[in-house]
């Protein structure tokens, strides 16, 4: 009887180990070559320079933050933290090249690399070409639901 209980416990341990191993296989960590800059920016939406962030699709560029600047994009108007996205404006593939800045025109839904015209979606930072696996580097946004937006890493 004792051997049977030990055998069942052994089977359970093996089963749980396999489940953990298999579930861990799908986790992928994005490795950027871009060094991690210190980012801690506070944006006040009531400031006239931030007016574009009061509408969905509006954006604001912080030229002296990150490596190539930071683009803040208004995705939604739910008064929640996920309303905004903040992206590094240095291309994940050409960040160290002079041409590697991402640009976007007001109302444009894409960020375009200056080196090869490759495009990324402004909504989520993903590449529109599956050959490019790295998305644009995204920073954390905290929004108080009213006037204050904080961008950090």
Question: Model regions: which residues?
Answer:
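Conserved binding/recognition cores within well-folded domains
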Residues: 17
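N-terminal pre-ligand scaffold of iron-sulfur
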Residues: 26-106, 121, 137-153
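Short cysteine-rich clusters marking metal-coordination/redox-active sites
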Residues: 91, 112-113
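Acidic, glycine-rich flexible loop segments
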Residues: 108, 115, 123-129
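Low-complexity, intrinsically disordered Gly/Pro/Thr-rich segments
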Residues: 124-140
């Amino acid at each position: 009887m004792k051997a049977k209980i030990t055998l069942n416990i052994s089977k359970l341990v093996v089963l749980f180990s396999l489940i953990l191993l298999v579930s861990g296989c799908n986790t992928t960590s994005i490795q950027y070559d871009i060094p991690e800059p210190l980012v801690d920016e506070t944006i006040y939406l009531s400031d006239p320079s931030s007016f574009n962030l009061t509408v969905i699709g509006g954006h604001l560029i912080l030229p002296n933050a990150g490596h190539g600047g930071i683009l803040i994009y208004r995705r939604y108007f739910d008064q929640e933290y996920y309303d905004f996205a903040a992206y590094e404006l240095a291309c994940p593939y050409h960040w160290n090249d002079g041409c590697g800045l991402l640009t976007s025109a007001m109302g444009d839904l894409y960020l375009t690399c200056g080196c090869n015209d490759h495009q990324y979606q402004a909504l989520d930072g993903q590449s529109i070409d599956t050959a490019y696996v790295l998305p644009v580097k995204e920073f954390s946004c905290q929004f108080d639901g009213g006037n204050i937006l904080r961008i950090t890493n």
